[in-house]
Amino acid sequence: MTWFIDRRLNGKNKSMVNRQRFLRRYKAQIKQSISEAMNKRSVTDVDSGESVSIPTEDISEPMFHQGRGGLRHRVHPGNDHFVQNDRIERPQGGGGGSGSGQGQASQDGEGQDEFVFQISKDEYLDLLFEDLALPNLKQNQQRQLTEYKTHRAGYTANGVPANISVVRSLQNSLARRTAMTAGKRRELHALEENLAIISNSEPAQLLEEERLRKEIAELRAKIERVPFIDTFDLRYKNYEKRPDPSSQAVMFCLMDVSGSMDQSTKDMAKRFYILLYLFLSRTYKNVEVVYIRHHTQAKEVDEHEFFYSQETGGTIVSSALKLMDEVVKERYNPAQWNIYAAQASDGDNWADDSPLCHEILAKKLLPVVRYYSYIEITRRAHQTLWREYEHLQSTFDNFAMQHIRDQDDIYPVFRELFHKQNATAKD
């Protein structure tokens, strides 16, 4: 029976190469479409695929055609509706729109539909997070305690009996005995053939036959003296410890839920948190999320309560920072976890509490986190909390802050916080 093995890299997806070429060629238009679609999508399906539309004129290619003007002679088919010099009415609905949309009729030229195609989840996320990096990753790794894990590393000639490899030792024994006795066995085989010939010959050659029997006995004795197993044959399983960088991260989501934070502001904060979570998930194998909501008191809650609880009150931001410090000390050792934090607020805070927030971040949190981002979602002027955080931004490289006014600012602000230039500034 004949077997055909398909070793093509693309398998049945024969057009994958053309698809990848298309994505590379029109990357700018696709990223623009994704950026616009990002602000329209539900927060629950941010990691699914996307239908991307590109204006037809953006993907048009140059082509050769006859120039306008000149004298041409053409022959057209006849008809039974029009005669020479008749005026042809314009079709109903016009053709100057941008395709088959719901726009009004136009009398200016002809329009074309936009080119629409579907991209997969992986393609969507690749384009969404392209040119982004985790800031200060290399600097923090240098002071991180590296864990070591034991891995198999072949075989060694020395070791403890518990690690002996029986199969490999017997293989070495067979190879050694074969190499040491191969010549003697060939010589023994030749002597046995000569003995058989002499034994059947006439007249009998008793002296020669006795000599051959004596040599055969000596060779067999030499072969038997080769030991079946020798210390030279023994092989032991070898193990070595290799550094195993931490592949787990924790993301702290801190949000103000005071009376000034309405549901639309919370939704904008949620979109930012989901972008950060997806971004971390593409870098670390295991990402845990800790939700801390606060007004005058801070509380660790689940995701649903974090975004949709109706509990409100005044605003004391330091309560959330204190709770985060307690959780880090209790559950997330900075030597084993990559700690990230994102804080969302409308900027309102008790005036006397803002300096305390500065002190907690500077002395307790920023020295142990990889990156701390603060987004202020408001259309009003900045208050004391923003001004205190500005001092932190000028002092700590792993602290960043941005201002969000409406939904369209979320994705650009996220890219600004995690652009690769920020990550490589000190490399």
UniProtKB/Swiss-Prot annotation:
Chain intervals for the UniProt region annotation (Disordered): 79-110
Biased segments, Basic and acidic residues type: 79-90
InterPro entries attached to this UniProt entry: UPF0229
Ranges of compositional bias, category Gly residues: 92-102
Pfam family, one: DUF444
HAMAP family found in the cross-reference section: UPF0229
Family: Belongs to the UPF0229 family.
Protein name: UPF0229 protein YeaH
Species in which this protein is naturally found: Shigella boydii serotype 18 (strain CDC 3083-94 / BS512)
